[in-house]
Design a protein with these regions (language model features):
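Conserved ASCE/P-loop NTPase catalytic core
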Residues: 1-269
């Protein structure tokens, strides 16, 4: 017998389905968390290690409405490759849109390859008949180069899903404790090629940060003073504006030239 509950093993003890109801001995904190989730307010928790701060923060994410969840996507910008376009869609739609674009890209690639094969066969056939086989081979080489450099790759047009949520899942809970600037604010990966037809499109190198993945959810940071001062300033800006663009965090990286449109990051911290 313990706490008015009789049991033989711990398996006999009923566990509440909701995480907030599993918190023991923090009645006032539980009440504050419930009110903050309802009113969408930030919470500062002060306490010794092991008192349930992270558990309360995670429980808060379960109290937020599921209907508001969204996916965030990055599209290529035809006018300015270094300024990718941001689009927000309902949760679950992002994967469907990406799959649809990939199918279109496959069909376009198949059509392009078929056209290239027909042209190669035609050029080689004509050069063989006319006795100019060497010129035909040179013409085929130029064809390959033209198709590779002048005709854009279909993959360039496929948007990238940087924040994905399930329609029936809880609001996201993201622990950003001790994160460096790129992990917290987002980053753009370095492209070692950058030209020659081997480069990776700018929008495909964009990576969401913790503040973006926590959009419509909870961002938890333990010991916020462990963050760099510049990261703290940027975090304050994101809190105030509710949006924050993603750019390369390293000055020596090619990603430093890329800056997206403002990305939604309306989180509770």
């Amino acid at each position: 017998l313990f706490g008015g509950v009789r049991f033989d093993t711990t398996a006999d003890i009923p566990i509440p389905a909701s995480l907030i109801d599993q918190v023991i001995g923090q009645e006032h904190a539980v009440d504050v968390i419930k009110k903050a989730a309802t009113q969408r307010r930030h919470v500062m928790m002060i306490g010794s290690p092991g008192t349930g701060k992270s558990m309360l923060a995670k429980a808060m994410s379960e109290l937020l409405p599921k209907e508001d969840m969204q996916d965030i996507m990055v599209y290529p910008n035809q006018e300015d490759n270094n300024n990718p376009i941001i689009r927000v869609v309902p949760a679950g739609r992002g994967k469907e849109i990406v799959a649809h674009h990939k199918e279109d890209a496959k069909r376009q690639a198949s059509s392009r390859n078929t056209l290239l094969i027909v042209l190669v066969i035609g050029v080689l056939g004509i050069s063989f008949i006319s006795g100019q086989l060497l010129m035909g081979i040179i013409a085929v080489a130029f064809l390959f180069m033209a198709f590779r450099s002048l005709i854009p790759k279909e993959s360039v047009m496929v948007p990238k899903l940087i924040v994905s949520n399930k329609p029936d899942s809880f609001a996201p809970f993201v622990d950003a404790t001790g994160s460096h600037a790129g992990a917290l604010l987002g980053d753009v990966r370095h492209d070692p090629f950058q030209s020659g037809g081997l480069e990776t499109p700018a929008h495909d190198r964009v990576e969401a940060g913790a503040i973006h993945r926590a959009h419509k959810g909870v961002l938890f940071i333990d010991e916020i003073n462990s963050l760099e001062y510049q990261s703290q300033q940027s975090l304050l800006t994101a809190l105030q504006e509710g949006v924050f663009p993603i750019t390369g965090q390293s000055e020596r990286s090619s990603g430093a030239m890329v800056r997206t449109e403002p990305v939604p990051c309306r989180f509770l911290m």
